[in-house]
């Protein structure tokens, strides 16, 4: 009981009692609440210190003066009041004393305001009322703003930062109300534009951006910035983009782009132009740097990394060099210089990867027996492990008779010969000599493999001679009687020109898509190749051809083919990253009656929203996964529909860290309660969420799924483990995969997949990455994501494609393979060795001062490898980097102001 009585006493001391007293006074003598409060305050006056008591009396006297009839006293009284409020120094957490003492008189003063005639005194009173209004936090009373609008003073900043923030908050609330009621908002906008410079002055750029964003006037921002504030404002704006909806996200990027251009930050502007996927803007930015050849080369590297086909007039040697940068021709050379520096040029054998001696001795012999299937797996492992180095011990050997091709059979020969393409990746000039001899052999599978190899080695690289066009865009090969050669040629073209939007290829490929006589396998491959070449361009000719095929009554039976999913994927890729623009196609697909229509629509939608982290889309996809499928003729289509929805959840969430965390939890639920078709897709989606980023929580879960009772779930989990660790040499994953090799030593298909995963894990001897995000994880590469998606769509039914005869589909992943290196060059593109610090990137958005952008760093000399989430910065100021992010190929310029060690 004692406790309760104590509690009531403390409650009495505080607010509760004031309210009670107010009622009492009103009842007894009908006084106004303000007077009631005054008496209450007097009762409590014993608690005030002498100074406070004096201040309180002074302020009360000033209020009295305002109520008197002598108008000459008003001005000095108001000035004294303002002075008192402005000079009060109280702690930031408490309400300033003058406001505390004036609050009881607030109602009195508002009445006075209503009674006074218009004039300076009235404005001055409104000024004071606006400040006292801060002490009321009712939702419906925006008094601070109300009186601020009535008082035309310009000197808002003198009331302090807290007041300005409070005002901004109320502007936002009132603006939303006025928009809802269709009332004019111009005065609010004008006031907001007065507050923005005040925010920027006190380093609260986040508040400035938020206020302008809320009032939809973000385009006005650039005129308020200067050299000191623009970088922080842009950093905040760009990091907000992922959380905004269309079209605000695009507006923000465009405004930030214009700010960077204004302050000559060309590389940062270019990164945003690339994110906007606006070719006109990219060309304009590129042309703007024509005075500075070194800068143009740096911009060319950025454009080339994204695989954007940019044409420009070449008139001199400098232009030729810039074109080399723009078309990635030197990529192979720089990659090999990295290999030399890291001392890994020596080719690795499959045994170096399998490490059979570490597998349990009982089954060690059995996982390594010599069969065509095992040799095919070895071919893939060799292809991935030595990718890009141009040397190995199985394919590029002295005598043709020793070549590994002869140890495989049928389609296996095609995939093995195609592995030459990955070994010689990006090295077109030398590569063609090695592959050429295989095109003359009589075995058609080997010819097919050679054509595919030509396509693979040209991926992400362009040359003037266009060997892929010359060798593959050949009617004889595209109409060859053997469908394998047709498929290989089409796939080769799709890889070689991925993302290039090359119009000349339409005449070769579009007819194949819509030809009703053609087998579904070839048509679908042509659709996928077109999707790759025109990724994200919403090319109408290709989309019409694919939709016509879907609408065609006669091709109904063809659409039941397992290959028809690639027809759908081809359509989806055309709208990659297009967001709202995909709705046109979704409407068209509603007219298609075939069960393939729904899965196609979902594929198109997930491609359009890839990497955006759009929460509403993820919710829609989760709803699709919840539906129960009835048995019937539409069952296959519905099952694919749910599998694509699961992949889509991963694809959309991959761009944003918080979304990833949440989605990984959803995947756990889907694995518990989902049907078999959903469970098969979950491991693939988990791999897609963090490719080349082996997070322990993800691979531990996948390791559990890799022993699942459903063999297809296990196979997909094994592949996902490979994808998760692709190119990282992660020791824990390597150990898990070796254990799986022993566990599945009797199961040929699972063992084949374990080998593929081991090859992926050690890709490029640990120097490559398949993560589609680059340039400090800001930009999502369309081409890379499209390649990953093609492999994963095939993996949904692994036993019909990858582990049976269509294993060559794995080579679509080549579009995503890229060195995770930092190579520094001088202005003549010669490698330059400098010291850099490499550490974990730290998010510094909105932090005060100039915080460190990396943590836990080590100093290394370039060229260096960068892991996922790592960032590099130059150790000293001897050189200035022309690129805003140290990643990939970076040009350094000597700093003219550097003193150095003289």
Curated annotation (Swiss-Prot):
Repeat positions for PC: 415-448, 449-487, 488-522, 525-559, 568-601, 645-680, 681-715, 716-750
Protein name as annotated: 26S proteasome regulatory subunit rpn-1
GO biological process: proteasome-mediated ubiquitin-dependent protein catabolic process; regulation of protein catabolic process
Residue numbers spanned by region Disordered: 1-54
Lineage: Eukaryota, Fungi, Dikarya, Ascomycota, Pezizomycotina
Function: Acts as a regulatory subunit of the 26 proteasome which is involved in the ATP-dependent degradation of ubiquitinated proteins.
Acidic residues: compositionally biased ranges: 42-52
A Pfam family assignment: RPN1_RPN2_N
InterPro entries: 26S_Psome_Rpn1, ARM-like, ARM-type_fold, Proteasome/cyclosome_rpt, RPN1_C, RPN1_N
SUPFAM superfamilies named among the record's database cross-references: ARM repeat (SSF48371)
Family from the record: Belongs to the proteasome subunit S2 family.
Keywords, sorted A to Z: Proteasome, Repeat
Highest taxon above the source species: Eukaryota
GO cellular component: ascospore-type prospore nucleus; nuclear periphery; nucleus; proteasome regulatory particle, base subcomplex; proteasome storage granule
Skewed-composition ranges (Basic and acidic residues): 1-41
A GO MF term: enzyme regulator activity
Gene3D superfamilies with a match to the protein in the record: Leucine-rich Repeat Variant
């Amino acid at each position: 009981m004692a406790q309760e009585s104590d509690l009531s006493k403390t409650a009495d001391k505080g607010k509760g009692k004031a309210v009670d007293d107010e009622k009492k006074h009103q009842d007894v003598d009908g006084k106004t609440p303000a007077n009631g409060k005054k008496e209450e305050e007097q009762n409590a006056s014993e608690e005030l210190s002498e100074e406070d008591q004096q201040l309180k009396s002074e302020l009360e006297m000033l209020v009295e003066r305002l109520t008197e009839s002598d108008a000459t006293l008003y001005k000095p009284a108001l000035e004294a009041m303002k002075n008192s409020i402005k000079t009060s120094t109280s702690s930031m957490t408490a309400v300033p004393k003058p406001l505390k003492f004036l609050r009881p008189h607030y109602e009195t003063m508002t009445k006075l305001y209503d009674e006074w005639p218009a004039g300076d005194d009235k404005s001055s009173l409104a000024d004071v009322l606006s400040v006292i209004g801060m002490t009321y936090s009712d939702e419906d009373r925006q008094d601070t703003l109300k009186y601020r609008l009535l008082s035309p003073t310009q000197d808002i900043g003198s009331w302090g930062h807290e007041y300005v923030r409070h005002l901004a908050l109320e502007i936002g609330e009132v603006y939303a109300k006025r928009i809802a009621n269709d009332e004019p908002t111009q005065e609010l906008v004008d006031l907001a534009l007065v507050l923005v410079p005040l925010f920027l002055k006190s380093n609260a750029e986040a508040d400035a951006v938020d206020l302008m964003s809320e009032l939809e006037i973000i385009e006005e921002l650039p005129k308020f910035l200067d050299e000191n504030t623009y970088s922080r404002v842009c950093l905040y704006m760009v990091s907000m983009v992922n959380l905004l909806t269309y079209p605000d996200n695009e507006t923000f990027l465009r405004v930030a782009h214009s700010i960077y251009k204004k302050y000559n930050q060309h590389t940062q502007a270019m990164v945003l132009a690339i994110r906007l996927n606006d070719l006109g803007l990219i060309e304009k930015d590129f042309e703007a740097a024509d005075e500075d050849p070194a800068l143009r080369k740096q911009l060319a590297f950025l454009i080339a990394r994204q695989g954007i086909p940019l044409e420009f007039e070449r008139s001199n040697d400098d232009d030729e060099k810039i074109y080399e940068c723009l078309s990635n021709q030197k990529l192979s050379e720089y990659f090999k210089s990295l290999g030399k520096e890291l001392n890994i040029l020596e080719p690795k054998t499959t045994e170096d990867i399998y490490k059979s001696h570490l597998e349990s001795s009982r089954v060690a012999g059995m996982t390594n027996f010599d069969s065509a299937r095992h040799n095919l797996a070895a071919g893939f492992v060799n292809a991935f492990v030595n990718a890009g180095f141009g040397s190995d011990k199985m394919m590029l050997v002295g005598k043709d008779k020793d070549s590994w091709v002869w140890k495989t059979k049928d389609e296996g020969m095609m995939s093995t010969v195609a592995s030459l393409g990955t070994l010689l990746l990006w090295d077109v000039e030398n590569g063609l000599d090695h592959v050429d001899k295989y095109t003359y052999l009589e075995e058609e599978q080997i010819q097919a493999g050679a054509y595919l190899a030509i396509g693979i080695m040209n991926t992400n690289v362009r040359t003037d001679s266009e060997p892929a066009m010359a060798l593959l865009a050949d009617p004889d090969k595209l109409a060859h009687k053997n469908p394998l050669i047709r498929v290989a040629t089409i796939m080769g073209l799709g890889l070689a020109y991925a993302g290039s939007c090359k119009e000349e290829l339409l005449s070769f490929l579009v007819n194949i898509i819509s030809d009703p006589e053609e087998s579904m396998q070839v048509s679908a491959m042509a659709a996928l190749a077109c999707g790759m070449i025109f990724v994200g361009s919403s090319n109408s000719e290709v989309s019409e051809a694919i939709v016509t095929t879907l609408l065609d009554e006669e091709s109904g039976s063809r659409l039941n083919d397992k290959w028809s999913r690639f027809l759908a994927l081809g359509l989806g890729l055309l709208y990659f990253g297009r967001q709202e623009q995909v709705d046109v196609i979704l409407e068209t697909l509603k007219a298609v009656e075939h069960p393939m229509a729904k899965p196609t629509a979902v594929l198109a939608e997930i491609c359009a929203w890839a990497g955006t982290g759009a929460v509403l889309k993820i919710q829609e996809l989760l709803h699709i996964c919840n539906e129960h499928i009835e048995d019937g003729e539409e069952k296959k289509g519905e099952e694919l529909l749910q599998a694509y929805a699961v992949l889509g959840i991963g694809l959309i969430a991959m761009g944003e860290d918080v979304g990833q965390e949440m989605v990984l939890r959803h995947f756990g639920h889907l694995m518990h309660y989902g049907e078999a078709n959903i469970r098969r897709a979950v491991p693939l989606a988990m791999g897609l969420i963090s490719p080349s980023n082996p997070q322990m929580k993800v691979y531990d879960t996948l390791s559990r799924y890799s022993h699942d009772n459903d063999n297809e779930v296990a196979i997909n989990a094994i592949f996902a483990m490979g994808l998760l660790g692709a190119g990282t040499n992660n020791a824990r994953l390597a150990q898990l995969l070796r254990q799986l090799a022993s566990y599945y030593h009797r199961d040929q298909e699972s063992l084949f997949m374990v080998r593929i995963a081991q090859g992926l894990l050690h890709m490029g001897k640990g120097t490559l990455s398949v993560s589609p995000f680059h340039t400090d994880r800001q930009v999502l590469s369309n081409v890379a994501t499209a390649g990953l998606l093609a492999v994963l769509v095939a993996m949904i039914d692994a036993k019909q494609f990858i582990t049976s005869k269509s294993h060559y589909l794995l080579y679509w992943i080549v579009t995503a393979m890229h060195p995770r290196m930092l190579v520094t060059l001088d202005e003549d593109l010669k490698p330059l060795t400098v010291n850099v610090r490499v550490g974990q990137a730290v998010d510094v958005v909105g932090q005060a001062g100039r915080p460190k952008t990396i943590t836990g760093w080590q100093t290394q000399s370039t060229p260096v490898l960068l892991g996922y989430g790592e960032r590099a910065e130059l150790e000293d100021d001897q050189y200035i980097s022309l690129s805003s992010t140290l990643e990939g190929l970076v040009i350094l310029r000597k700093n003219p102001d550097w003193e150095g060690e003289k």
